Every structure is written in C-alpha cells, then in structure tokens.
Amino acid sequence: MLVWMMWKRWFIREIYLEEIRQMNMKLCLIYNYAQHYRTSIFKLIDQEFDCDFVFGDSMGDVKKMDYTLLKGNVKEVHNKKLGGAYFQKGVLKLLGQKYDKYIMLGETRCISTWIFLLLSKFYKNKNVYLWSHGWYGKETKFERIIKKMFFKLSDGTFLYGNYARELMIKEGFNKDRLFVIHNSLAYDKQLATRKQLKPTDIYNIHYGNNNPNLVFVGRLTEVKKLDMILHAMSKCKDKGEEYNLTLIGDGEKKEELEKLATELNLTKNVWFYGPCYNETELGGLIYNADLCVSPGNVGLTAMHSLVFGTPVITHNYFPLQMPEFESIREGETGTFFEHENIDSLTQKINEWFSTPRNREETRKMCMKEIDEYWTPYYQIEVLKKNLR
C-alpha cells in the first residue's frame, strides 16, 4: 500500500510538472509562408501555446493569411531562391533566442533548415520538430539518403498521414518520433455552412434530368487529368449509364475540356460552373452532388468534398497522391480506380451507383471522417500531446 501511495504521488507530481513545463514553454514556428487556408490551425497554435511566428514572404500567387489574427509576435523573412532550393534570411539567429522548441516546415530544399537543424545540436534543452509530407514512396536512392539525413536531425516529425509514417518506419525511423497530424481547412466556417445546407433540386433544374451528379472542385489544369472524367462518361453513356458533371473552377484547360465535351456529345451533361468563392453556394453544390471525381492527385479537394457530405473517387497510386487520399475509406467515403486507367474509372463510377446505398448515411460517414480526423482541433491535440 505504501509503495502504491508513493507511486501515485510521483505520477501526479509528474503530470503537474509536465503541465507547468508546457505552460512555460516558449515555441517558435518557422514556415515557408503563411498560407491563408492554414489560418485556423495557426490561430489555435497561437491560443494554446506561447508562440512566435516566422513566415517566408512569398509563395507564388498563394493567398496570405491576415497576421493581425495572431497575438504572438509575427516576423516575415525573405525566401531567397537558390536554383531549386531556397534560404530563409534571419532564421538562424533564432536559435540563440529564448525559445524552448521550434516547429519548422520539413522541406529538404530549404538550406537554412538544414543549417538550423545541424546547429541546434550545440544548444542544450532546445528541440526542433519538422512538419512535413515526409515520405512519398517514389524516392530515388539518392533522395532516400538525403531524406534520412534530414529527418533524423530533428527531434520529431509531424506528418500529414499514416501512409508516410509507415513508409518511414520501414526506412528505420523511430516510430515514437513520428506523429500523424493530418491537414485541415477553415473547419469552423465550413461547419457553420454545413448546418444550413439541405437537399435541393439545383441539378435537376439545370440539367433537366434525374441522372446521378458528378462534381469536381478545383483548378482546371493538366495535372488534374479532367479529360479522363469526360472519356469515362462517354464510355458509361455507351453502356446506357448517363451522368451529369459539374466542374467548379477555372483554369487553362477549360477551352480544351469544352471542346472535348462537344466532341464526345456531352455538352448537355457538363456544366462549366466557373470559380465559386461563396462558401454557402459552394457547399450547396457539393452537398447536392452524388460523387466527387478527382482523376489526378486529390489533395484538399477530398477534404472540401467530404466535409459537405459527398464521397470521392481518385486514383490508387499512392506514391503520386497527396496525403488527403487517406480520408477516402473504400466503399464508405469513396473509392479508388487504377491510376491513369479510363476503363477502371468507368467501371468504378458505374459500380458506385449500381451498389445500393443510402445517400444520407453516406453523407454522414463523409462528414464524420472530417469531423474526427481532419480539423484544426485534431491537429492542436496532436501538437499538445507531442511537444513535450
């Protein structure tokens, strides 16, 4: 009994001390850019930690978040391009400042991150964590060597998915230093929008038919391989199965896709909706569709579709996928077709609709997947648990 009481007191004391350590911990987040879509998680980090933020100054035409939403100190540094690499000016001196832990974007092409990781080994009681895609499964021998050196310099890595974590464990990384954090969008806004949504006949009115409705949300670009959807629809039509397709977005492939739709006699079944920046309007379009089709890399499109209750189909070659493919649960929140195989895409679309399903139950499963694993609240709990 005495031993039990002593152990219990020690355990309670350790929990208390850990809470004190976390309360007093000074964190610094160093990122390549303050992407607008990451606003929610950056705000939560700001609320839950004593954190300063250091962001790179440019990332093409990607929208930047509003720095005034963060109460912690925010500093913008110049991302100096060096061929295919880059260097963040002013980052190295942060090692000498009063921070206990650092979170850095884990990009091997960032030279300043390499130097930062190496120099951190000379600073006692400072920990550097990386936030990264980690492993894809398509790395060359040289890339594997470089990545192993890079990630093993850190004290831990926050990964977007379990797929990357399993690959890294197979490469010899310590599983206790690999943390799956997933990804997130503007979840609170999407949730508020979702609560207002209800089934409508928007597609029946536009198309004048009762066909199942396919949808794609994103830029109409080459990498999305959207021509595959049109060819698959044509093959389905030859077999007596007709579908509607709504393309929400714009891009350099629009005219080419319009021409292809005409050639395949699908103009009455394809709606080039254009870009949509109103979340309520966009949410309604996704919510009332039956299946989101993303033949290329699915990425954030999967999260956007699932949060509003629509399942997703994409290709099954995971080394070329983005981590969000993990939100697709076979037969529940979507399905996969063979990479770059139009016949397989055709078959999978037909199979999805020929299998008896309760649309409302599918909707709930899609929403549940996002609600449980792909929110800033899930991410902040992973950070709080592992930044110790």
Question: Across the structure, where does each feature detected by a protein language model lie?
Answer:
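Donor nucleotide-sugar binding/catalytic pocket of nucleotide-sugar-dependent glycosyltransferases
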Residues: K152-I202, N209
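A charged, aromatic-enriched C-terminal amphipathic alpha-helix characteristic of glycosyltransferases
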Residues: S354-L387
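Acidic donor-binding loop of glycosyltransferase active sites
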Residues: G284-N297, T310-P311
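Short hydrophobic beta-strand element within catalytic cores of glycosyltransferases
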Residues: P311-L320
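Conserved acidic donor-binding segment of nucleotide-sugar-dependent glycosyltransferases
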Residues: P275, E330-I342, N350-R357
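Conserved donor-binding/catalytic core segment of Leloir-type glycosyltransferases
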Residues: I202-K224, L230-M233
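Nucleotide-activated donor-binding/catalytic signature segment of Leloir-type glycosyltransferases, i.e.
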Residues: I248, E255-C276
